[in-house]
Swiss-Prot record:
This is Glycerophosphocholine cholinephosphodiesterase ENPP6. The modification Phosphoserine is found at S71. Keywords: Cell membrane, Disulfide bond, Glycoprotein, GPI-anchor, Hydrolase, Lipid degradation, Lipid metabolism, Lipoprotein, Membrane, Metal-binding, Phosphoprotein, Signal, Zinc. InterPro entries: Alkaline_phosphatase_core_sf, Phosphodiest/P_Trfase.
Amino acid sequence: MAGKLWTFLLLFGFSWVWPASAHRKLLVLLLDGFRSDYISEDALASLPGFREIVNRGVKVDYLTPDFPSLSYPNYYTLMTGRHCEVHQMIGNYMWDPRTNKSFDIGVNRDSLMPLWWNGSEPLWITLMKARRKVYMYYWPGCEVEILGVRPTYCLEYKNVPTDINFANAVSDALDSLKSGRADLAAIYHERIDVEGHHYGPSSPQRKDALKAVDTVLKYMTQWIQERGLQNDLNVILFSDHGMTDIFWMDKVIELSKYISLDDLQQVKDQGPVVSLWPVPEKHSEIYHKLRTVEHMTVYEKEAIPNRFYYKKGKFVSPLTLVADEGWFIAESREALPFWMNSTGKREGWQHGWHGYDNELMDMRGIFLAFGPDFKSNFRAAPIRSVDVYNIMCNVVGITPLPNNGSWSRVVCMLKSQTSSSPSIPPNSCALVLILLLYFV
């Protein structure tokens, strides 16, 4: 019954009264595929940019992503504070059988349809509605009109941003924040994720990508001082998920060996989580055949574990396959997502992946923050991706929409904790009582 009550509150726009902090500017950096141990205490010794940020601000032990530990679901979880089954962005690849439209990791035209994005209101849209100004750089979805609104400025993602692109975005964002053109600036950077996929999370290439980011961050702290923003700007860095090693030589599950692909209406994605829409009369047969396959679990929709906060999503398929860590599900070996390596052909093997059970250690991400509202040299306990939204709302001084995050997990990061916790006004207390009587 508690779940029904929460759904009711979300649907009808119930929100808490939020005594917000002073309205300061915010710079957000989303570093894709950044695993928590990339900035372990030992690693920080050779990362002066990150080390300075950690010494000046807050570092959590790790951030647990939402399930599935994929990019688009967590992009939206981070910016809404809601689980995937609430905001509806449940995968990098989705299909809507009612309209026969597909979302293919944001690259196809149909991915821009409101169908996929209007399930929840992300922070940048809330700020725009409040007449705040938002600048976004390479951020997936900033080019989309969501609930009839777009950000003030969107530098659209076209190709993987280079290290120079990232540095230029940081510099331009700081200029925009200093001049008053922006109240929030948000920057997405992907290279750590790309190198982790291609070469593996422990590879020299991934480590080089991290060092390049570290160099930009070292300059960023200098640029903040040069622009006189140190007393008026909070900076938050986080990742969407981690990365683990995969081995295509001997850890691939080929669906074509167990079922006829002609018995499927649709297949979406490959890797740790695969969505299947069987021809209706073949559903039971396919389910029972796949139940015997080792190193993966097949779930009918209602049997998906509640802890994933996934199965109530409207785009969730009748059958969901979840691989064991390090295993990769594909229709066949020929259909594996090879990448274009130095040969100029798509024949490069992937050596890292994510999307697995979100509680696995290798799926953990990062959260760092510094600025006038955050404590200095503070280590915080682990948080979850749903928690990030509340802390962002607080430091920009805006009331958060109803969400799944825990304020108690993040309030410890702030210098001032006495006036920042959510409270319920008297008239809302009466509403809660009525709802409890109705639902319980």
